[in-house]
Amino acid sequence: MRILDFPILVCLLSASPASPLISQALPVGVEHVQTLDGIEEYRLSSNGLGILLMPNEGLPVATVMVTYKVGSRNEVTGTTGATHILEHMMFKGTEKFNSAKGFDYSSQMERIGARANATTWFDRTNYYATMPSEYVSMAIELEADRMRGLLIREEDLASEMTVVSNEYERGENSPVRTLIKELFATAYMAHPYSHPTIGWRSDIESTSVEELR
């Protein structure tokens, strides 16, 4: 699956009163866009990556979030649910960090006491982790690594399909989720919002490694 548009990196920092980007000269290739309600916006000139920096002095922790402006609306009939499955695959390992080497993304996050998760929606997919603030650089390195070097293997897809199928069944057994799914399918008949972010069962079951790549 080809990622569309440029992602946004969001950092909620709880370190010093002034963040490094604010108090020091900007690194080459980073431009300041604006300041709004205490939020600093930057842009990486080489690829358009947006950066939002939100300092918070309350606790010695930080949250790093990467949001890709692609979601289930970018899917077509036959590939619905692929974005959500790819979200799951993002935790399975990369060329550099993988279970075969003994340290994949999840194990690295656990080692530093971080809590990581992700969500998929119609217009975006986001990945986030909260950790002690001294590990922000490591979290960003891991995000950059899986952005570029994700391993999408048959065995990993097979294991995640069980997880995704169980998630799908929970939704089918929820009256509220079923109502919302039918509402969107009726209201957006000629629009990609008509299919749920988790996808249709037949499409989920036929998802292949080639499609995800």
What name fits each language-model region?
Residues L21-I22, G93-T94, A139, R146, ...:
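Scaffold signal of the M16-like zinc-metallopeptidase fold and its non-catalytic homologs
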Residues V28-T67:
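Mature N-terminal segment immediately following signal peptide/propeptide cleavage
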Residues A15-A25:
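Boundary at the C-terminal end of the N-terminal hydrophobic targeting segment
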Residues G102, E110, L151-E169:
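Acidic/histidine-enriched alpha-helical segments
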Residues D5-P17:
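Bacterial N-terminal signal peptides
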Residues T63-T130, N173, S194-I198:
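M16/MPP (pitrilysin/insulinase) zinc-metallopeptidase core fold and M16-derived inactive scaffolds
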Residues G48, V66, H84-L86, Y127, ...:
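Buried hydrophobic packing residues in well-ordered domains
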Residues E95-K96, T130-M161:
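M16/insulysin-pitrilysin zinc metalloprotease superfamily fold
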